[in-house]
Amino acid sequence: MTDQIAQNSARPAWETSDHIDDQVVNELRQKFGPDAFTFQPTRTGMPVVWVKREQLIEVMQYLKSLPKPYVMLYDLHGVDERVRTHRQGLPAADFSVFYHLISLDRNKDIMLKVALSEKDLNLPTLTSIFPNSNWYEREVWDMFGIVFNGHPNLRRIMMLPNWEGHPLRKDYPARATEFDPYVLTKQKEDLEMESLTFKPEEWGMKRGTENEDFMFLNLGPNHPSSHGAFRIILQLDGEEIVNCVPDVGYHHRGAEKMGERQSWHSYIPYTDRIEYLGGCVNEMPYVLAVEKLAGIEVPERVKVIRVMLSELFRINSHLLYISTFIQDVGAMTPVFFAFTDRQKVYDIVEAITGFRMHPAWFRIGGVAHDLPKGWERLLREFLDWMPKRLDSYVKAALQNSILKGRTIGVASYNAKEALDWGVTGAGLRATGVEFDVRKWRPYSGYENFEFEIPVASNGDCYDRVMLKVEELRQSLRILEQCYKNMPAGPFKADHPLTTPPPKERTLQHIETMINHFLQVSWGPVMPANESFQMVEATKGINSYYLTSDGSTMSYRTRIRTPSFAHLQQIPAVIRGSLVSDLIVYLGSIDFVMSDVDR
């Protein structure tokens, strides 16, 4: 792993490359021929390979069967290519679908793309190779109208069942003012409610057997244990779960569509709200991806400040997760303790950024302003306070015999199952896979920090919560190093696309002042290219895949969140368990619906 990290860091993150020297490219050429593919130079940091639709299944099977296989379908989505101007050298396409695969043995990624004509929008499903492609293919159909032949149940997932149109197409309106006035008649309301009625036959479920009928129970979308606007339809035989269907989309806001109508700079506040507990952690992949497009290298002080804010929000999120998990099992007191501790985190965040939950504080090329006087004292007080409090959570609640009895051995899965379903974060590390982006693919200077990656082996509810406790301790270690080793220097990069540019120079240089005016009013113009950045977020791996067409706005903003993949796995894990086990399992996943629905 160390050699691979060194290899990855040798090439500048913003360098445009087709990666034809990558080992997997040679393997593909040897198998399918030297002229079988088109290689696209990008700033994604991985080979981007256009394949023919007829070859897609064979190529996928080959990549998954290599000696060092690509075991995870990390992401799958689409792009409306019809009005894109900068696509020289690429196959003709009205639409394209991309498949992002990860190989843990190589610590490498590859992206496959398929070009499609508007008159022939169909592809073969990958559900027999990667089971987690199910929801991703449903979302691509929902957003673009691309059909996946052989899909077990191709239907809408984000929008209402009777929704008209496909929102991520370029000819679909992006603003409410572009629609006719909305009128909800009684007849329409009845139709909307009827469309949400669950029909077991549509999902391959039986209503009963010769001897007994099954009960179908709605858990949510308004239920304290569903952790948000989330509905699960349960097929029950008494208390035993025969099968279930997660129903998401109630919290969908069109975050990716908004990215096409906001400037690169003005989209930053939206990133905070993708996973509304993560704060600056959510800003990190976006600004890093934009900086790759711009070719910006930020100062060391900026890197450490960003790490410090990210780890503060990681602690904040983990505290809420641990305490609400304990509450789901039946204990109330730890929640109130946790909110006391989280208040201390928010006090530090507010002192530094001016805001609490959603600071929108990272900037393209730096941060909004320098650290204030006295930040060291606040951080020092928190570092002295938190370790003992963490010990009390473990002693008072997590070592409780009742909690252990409810969680040990419950909702367990192994590493292969986790990888098949695209699980990342603590859910993957609980199965023994030591994959943490901060260590394996360091960003923002994480390679300069000393910390461990906690892992477990049972993959059950108890392992997942205890891993979060250990991750909290490691975050405190990182914060201690930020406190002791904060570099001096500027808080913004000296680069023309730093947004907004350093204010001081606008008073001395007319060109800088004009540049400042244009970037604040219209937004910076990013070079036409594609970039990608993943980070170890609070709930797993979060990433942004950005496409620039040489404009002040993104041509396509793809947001891959961990919770979407984690909820898709629920039926495979919980079948055969009790309803009470489902409640504990939901509490152990660590999700919020804004992260799922975007």
Curated annotation (Swiss-Prot):
Major location (coarse): membrane
Enzyme class: translocase
A Pfam family it matches: Complex1_49kDa
Keywords: Cell inner membrane, Cell membrane, Membrane, Multifunctional enzyme, NAD, Quinone, Translocase, Transport, Ubiquinone
NADH dehydrogenase I subunit C: annotated segments: 1-189
E.C. designation(s): 7.1.1.-
Recorded catalytic activity of this chain's protein: a quinone + NADH + 5 H(+)(in) = a quinol + NAD(+) + 4 H(+)(out)
InterPro entries: NADH_DH_suC, NADH_DH_suCD, NADH_Q_OxRdtase_suD, NADH_quin_OxRdtase_su_C/D-like, NADH_UbQ_OxRdtase_30kDa_su, NADH_UbQ_OxRdtase_49kDa_CS, NADH_UbQ_OxRdtase_CS, NDH1_su_D/H
GO cellular component, one term: plasma membrane
Annotated region (NADH dehydrogenase I subunit D), positions in chain: 213-598
MF-aspect GO terms: NAD binding; NADH dehydrogenase (ubiquinone) activity; NADH:ubiquinone reductase (non-electrogenic) activity; quinone binding
Source superkingdom: Bacteria
Topology class, membrane: Peripheral membrane protein
Subcellular location: Cell inner membrane
Family statement drawn from the similarity comment of this UniProt entry: In the N-terminal section; belongs to the complex I 30 kDa subunit family. In the C-terminal section; belongs to the complex I 49 kDa subunit family.
PANTHER family assigned: NADH-QUINONE OXIDOREDUCTASE SUBUNIT C_D (PTHR11993:SF45), NADH-UBIQUINONE OXIDOREDUCTASE 49 KDA SUBUNIT (PTHR11993)
Annotated function: NDH-1 shuttles electrons from NADH, via FMN and iron-sulfur (Fe-S) centers, to quinones in the respiratory chain. The immediate electron acceptor for the enzyme in this species is believed to be ubiquinone. Couples the redox reaction to proton translocation (for every two electrons transferred, four hydrogen ions are translocated across the cytoplasmic membrane), and thus conserves the redox energy in a proton gradient.
Assembly behavior: NDH-1 is composed of 13 different subunits. Subunits NuoB, CD, E, F, and G constitute the peripheral sector of the complex.
Protein name: NADH-quinone oxidoreductase subunit C/D
Gene: nuoC
